[in-house]
Amino acid sequence: MLDNVLRIATRQSPLALWQAHYVKDKLMASHPGLVVELVPMVTRGDVILDTPLAKVGGKGLFVKELEVALLENRADIAVHSMKDVPVEFPQGLGLVTICEREDPRDAFVSNNYDSLDALPAGSIVGTSSLRRQCQLAERRPDLIIRSLRGNVGTRLSKLDNGEYDAIILAVAGLKRLGLESRIRAALPPEISLPAVGQGAVGIECRLDDTRTRELLAALNHHETALRVTAERAMNTRLEGGCQVPIGSYAELIDGEIWLCALVGAPDGSQIIRGERRGAPQDAEQMGISLAEELLNNGAREILAEVYNGEAPA
């Protein structure tokens, strides 16, 4: 690798490429003279489109191939949507930078209805997420929830073709792709608690690559990193992947971290909720403590069913 070149491993979806270009532009602005190249790749999660993600199984469906490129020195960094990043990393790799968070909320998208509550009974709602599914089913058990896979453009096309009455997407993804006008309503966290890390972009690299880590330091956003640390600590203790019915959202309010989380049965019949408030330096411990509370209050049994009988210890 040339001293002035940095290679970014990225998925090829429009949203992934937006994220990679975002990081590229930030790096070049912070380090004039640096040449940044994109290394587009296809992941397992991009290829398996006819099966709900929860049934595909495995963690890191959208990141593994990028990590192999890092380990084989075909790329220097991998740029991820934080909600896709597993809680464990291959030996020698780690998450070193978290960029400033975009709006973390879920978006209600429909051509005919202004809000979730305006949908008539029996309406078909599309989502690929068990987390969204369980919260939708709890609030509106009279709706029909169907799996929805593919990139943002594909999902919107299926809505426009009449396959769904409404779909749920991430506000951040729509905004980044210039599709903010498609959002009928942003769902507040009390209606649809976001995924761990939703709206944040994370950067992974080889932990022994000091030069790259120094280049990335300027992109780290301290407040976002604190919030995501609390959310991910909770998820790690729950052994959650990106396809389990777990929601978590942390905010910094008046110098304190407020952390909310839930674990839900996919059919919405039971949702275990909890929250914590504490000092920023205790972010990780707060996440672990909240996870323990959820497990003790019934989340262990819910997750055992989702994980085919293998509950978190």
UniProtKB/Swiss-Prot annotation:
One of its GO terms (cellular component) is cytoplasm. It catalyses: 4 porphobilinogen + H2O = hydroxymethylbilane + 4 NH4(+). Binds 1 dipyrromethane group covalently. Pathway: Porphyrin-containing compound metabolism; protoporphyrin-IX biosynthesis; coproporphyrinogen-III from 5-aminolevulinate: step 2/4. GO terms for biological process: protoporphyrinogen IX biosynthetic process. Tetrapolymerization of the monopyrrole PBG into the hydroxymethylbilane pre-uroporphyrinogen in several discrete steps. This is Porphobilinogen deaminase. It comes from Shigella flexneri.
